């Protein structure tokens, strides 16, 4: 553009036109401190072709009295039409660049200086930055177009100039003297490469200092994936299986890699930080973080895998935001391919998301590429985040772990255990989830809808509500090597080839998933909404007098302070009255005043929604509620009998709620809770007997409300066992029993007015049946029909009559005996 007088004339006009809008300055007055030898010719090196960058450079050179880059210059007999060159060639319209080869101007300069000993040329590397540094920029709109490490096309460059041109900065760097390089006598080609390398490293380091480091591995990693031995073998197998040329199968593997891989950019991280800072402090009342210091202590020297619970779509962004704000590297986040939507998907990818398909079944090439991608992340030490629950919990409970990602992680660690892997559980608790109303529909039986970009905008309609606070608790880390030492001693001595899949792997993976789930529950953040939901949903009319509700909340807080669930569990600040006022301000409870005071209650919509928040902390109260349940139908009970019944029910509660204690630890915890219940007046101890309060007393009401928090869970257990016993030995398959349990639960919920749709959640019944099989209480014959041990009758009647009222047991037995399921038992 500037190689002839006419071109220079046109260029001058364009520069003046550009500066009608653009304003530029040099960084740290770098143009004034170059220490140039004015007797030697000066050339300018720009990192990549951009006419706007050249115009800004020419403008700043004119301001500083430096030689202009667009004017001719001579080096001995060599006459150059302009005093600048680009280190990389011009990109095409798609933004693609061929970085091979050296700039012709540099080739000629090295030749001229080499051939004429008295000559030298000074090359000044110049970098032009559009807009402020990402760390200083506060406008999310401007951050979208800020300088990044990605190669950009002309359209984006135009938008960058228009949006960021008022704050353009130029960095002049110390000149490189070609004479000094030539004096190394490395020959022409090596000297040219040396000069290129010097400038390339310089530009990279300067850019990292100004806009942040290049944290994207996408451009190099994806191509490297197809050269891994496991992927090469999968490519060859794919080509043979599908009768494809090898090149086509390799191209397919590359497409899979690009579909999967994240594309981290510092500017995207800063953009998300700015937007999310507004979001958490305007939509929510901020974020309360606990125990992050332990992560800061273990992150150096470890491959950290964050395993949060999954409650909302914004979980994907929340943890990355918090880690970035606390000086930790944001992780690469596993996201479902359904989130790879227009606009949103690209932003998530640049924020660190990598995308995975819901199933790998029937696609071994995709499986090989994905496994190798994760293995590369782990071995290179990139932090990773994935959700062991798989999808978002619609009920507020911890879902049963999906072990696919854990299995991939375990196999990767067995391949290479040089970098120690540590899992960091992260509990995320919301006082109100953004998708609450969507979950409400699904809780009421609506089918789960596929995510759409429009869902993002639907949420904005609810943003006038108050969403309260977000709580993030970092749980106890799980060191993978130590876990394997416990599960499989001697694993280090086994042959861990790339295809190594030992017999014990599946069982170890399942136990790892359960361990992660337990550690997540241990880190629960109990908030005011959880406790108010727990109290009101335990009443028969979903209502309490304000003074009574205050007493219940004060009791729960006192119990939890006396017997903490775990060192990582956190409690809300304030007393019961403060908790009520907080929940009232969020419009989650309705109220009615009369002459005697204020009654707080749950209306129909909030009653279902509040089951979600109750379920968040149901595991915290499971054991004290179970102990309280034994005193609803018995006025007194011995410590021995209490222990016997708790031990009988505990395996099923532990499996459903991921309770933290082993059977060996249970007696000690039972004693701690009995002491607390006695001190709070809910029980009285008489030697080895524990006695309930008088049925007319306030303490008995409190004991009853505590017991009711676990009643629905115990009802489901009794339903399943009653149906099985009434059907007889080897009459029902597990699937048929599940279906009957769901129908029975739906009928009972109508008869008893239960407003809790998860009461007839099929997955809860399925898991209970699986636990009965694991405990040896049930067994399946060759046809899949279920037989049962005598212990089932003891569990169904001996224990149930202690924790469920006679009326409730009778109602369940009647439905079980007179069921009209439309199916003959013999055909099930």
Swiss-Prot record:
The HXXXXD motif is essential for acyltransferase activity and may constitute the binding site for the phosphate moiety of the glycerol-3-phosphate. SMART domains: PlsC. One of its GO terms (cellular component) is plasma membrane. It catalyses: sn-glycerol 3-phosphate + an acyl-CoA = a 1-acyl-sn-glycero-3-phosphate + CoA. It is a peripheral membrane protein. Its EC number is 2.3.1.15. This is Glycerol-3-phosphate acyltransferase. HAMAP family: Glyc3P_acyltrans. Keywords: Acyltransferase, Cell inner membrane, Cell membrane, Lipid biosynthesis, Lipid metabolism, Membrane, Phospholipid biosynthesis, Phospholipid metabolism, Transferase. Pfam families: Acyltransferase, GPAT_C. It is an enzyme of class 2 (transferase). A motif (HXXXXD motif) lies at residues 309-314. GO terms for molecular function: glycerol-3-phosphate O-acyltransferase activity. The keyword rRNA-binding does not apply. The gene is plsB. Belongs to the GPAT/DAPAT family. It is found in: Cell inner membrane. Pathway: Phospholipid metabolism; CDP-diacylglycerol biosynthesis; CDP-diacylglycerol from sn-glycerol 3-phosphate: step 1/3.
